[in-house]
Structure formats: C-alpha cells, structure tokens
Design a protein with these regions (language model features):
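N-proximal low-complexity "stem/linker" segments adjacent to membrane-targeting elements
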Residues: 1-27
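Acidic helix N-cap motif at the loop->helix transition within catalytic regions
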Residues: 17-20, 45-53, 94, 98
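A conserved acidic beta->alpha catalytic loop
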Residues: 25, 32, 40-49, 66-68, ...
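Glycine-rich, basic loop-to-helix element that forms the pyrophosphate-binding segment
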Residues: 64-81, 102
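Conserved nucleotide-sugar donor-binding catalytic segment
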Residues: 79, 132, 136-214, 218
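Short aromatic/hydrophobic "clamp" motif used to bind/position activated sugar donors
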Residues: 86
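The conserved acidic donor/metal-binding loop of glycosyltransferases
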Residues: 90-94, 118
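Conserved donor NDP-sugar-binding/catalytic core segment of glycosyltransferases
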Residues: 98-129
C-alpha cells in the first residue's frame, strides 16, 4: 500500500464513445497522486484504442479473459489497487477537477474513513439534465440498508481502514454490494461532502413493462444471495428500498 495514493477503480465495456472524456477528467485532477485501474470486460468497440491514446504511466489497463460482468471486473481492479484511498469512476461518468483534492482534505480534516459527494446528471452528449443529487449528511448502517444514498462515482474509502473488499458475482446492484461489505465493519458511517464534484451520465435504456418487478428482484437478490440475508428479511429490505427510493427522489434530487 502506498500512502497518499488514490486507486481509481474503472470497469469498462464498450464505452469507447465516452471513456476519453472520463479519463481526461481524471488527468485534470488537482490532486495528482493517483493510479487509474481500467479493467476492460471484453469490449468489442474501440475502447482499447481510446485508452492507449493516453500516454500517462498512472493509467493501467487490464483485460478480463472472458466477459465477466461489473461485479467480478471491479473485484479484479480492487485486487490490483495499491492506494491508501479507493475511489470509483465508471467509464462514462465525469469528475470535477477538484474532486480528489477536496474529498481527501474533507476526510483527513474530520478523520473520516468513508465519504461521498453531491453530483449532477448529464445526458449522452454531456448536456446537463439540470438534476442535482445530494443525500443525508451521515449514513449509518441502518440507513444504508434502507436505501443506497451514495453515488458510486463519488464514493471514497480508506483501504487502511477497510482492507481488500470483494463481492459476490451479482449482475445488478453490485455497487450497492460494495457498500454493504464496507458497512459490515462495526460503527461504519459515510459522510457527505456538500459539494458537486462529479457528473453522472444517464444513458438511454429500453423501457420495460415489468421494470418494477425486475428492480424488486435485483434488490432481493442483493440482500439474499449477496448479503446472505434470509429470504423473508431480504424481501423486507427490497420493499423498504422501493419506498425510500421514492423518498430520495423527492428529498435529495433537485431540478436546477
């Protein structure tokens, strides 16, 4: 482990259209002590060529031998991480230039081992959607099981405090699964830095008539298969998540 180093976990799959802008947002950081760990999950587009165009020794590209999904891809990157701090950035999202500097200062100043920030949303062409996302100032274990308030692209934690995090091969909500692993440590809390330091890209998806059912099942699988909760408890948490998801949109998402 290297003191002060931030290991940035970036899974990629067919994001050649976006990944250059994402990587550039990392290069533009005012905090320069980082390593960007890109694990490509057998992309069939030009992702490799785009990544190779960046001549920066801090950028490290790895490849899965077969298409494995985001959970195992993140696990791979986490095993390669050498940093004191672990951060996450998907290959189509963007950081503001001060993201790492301000977040590390916030954590060091307050003695926090886990934090997250505010962010806004953009569309596929990087145009603002005028949606600003915040969250509770403090998230404890109880609140984390109610709903995942933490944006994956904003989260940072201390590797010294939590060690190596690995999750089960779950297809949906694998970012939530990482946080549930962190919250297994007694007394864990996540703290909000009230500053917009990231931009989340909303990409078009096909509309499904059974969207609610699929979302409910993905949460049930998260709590039952990944977090190993009994079926009844997993079903309860899945229901609670549906309710608090609506509350989160009302309370913490603002049209600007």
């Amino acid at each position: 482990m290297t003191d002060g180093l931030v290991s940035i976990i970036m899974p990629s799959w067919n994001t050649g259209r976006y990944i250059a802008e994402t990587i550039q947002s990392v290069i533009n950081q005012t905090y320069g002590n980082w390593e960007l760990l890109i694990v490509d999950d057998c992309s069939t587009d030009n992702t490799d060529l785009v990544v190779a165009s960046f001549k920066d020794s801090r950028i490290k590209l790895f490849h899965n031998k077969k298409n494995s999904g985001a959970a195992l891809t993140r696990n791979y990157a986490l095993r390669k991480a050498q940093g004191e701090w672990i951060a996450f950035l998907d290959s189509d999202d963007i950081w503001m230039p001060q993201k790492l500097e301000h977040q590390i200062d916030f954590m060091k100043k307050n003695g926090y081992s886990l934090s997250f920030t505010e962010y806004d949303k953009i569309d596929e062409e990087s145009n603002p959607l005028n949606i600003y996302v915040s969250g509770p100032e403090k998230v404890n274990r109880h609140r984390m099981y109610n709903y995942d308030y933490i944006g994956q692209l904003t989260m940072m934690y201390s590797a010294k405090e939590f060690g190596l995090i690995q999750i089960k091969d779950i297809k949906k909500n694998n970012d939530y699964a990482i946080r549930l692993q962190l919250f297994k440590k007694p007394g864990t809390c996540a703290y909000l830095l009230k500053e917009k330091l990231a931009r989340y890209r909303v990409r078009k998806v096909s509309i499904s008539h059974d969207k609610f059912r699929k979302k409910f099942k993905s949460h049930y699988d998260l709590f039952h298969l990944c977090d190993e909760k009994p079926a009844v408890i997993a079903m309860w948490y899945a229901c609670v998540n549906m309710i608090f998801g609506l509350i989160k949109k009302i309370r913490y998402e603002t049209k600007t």
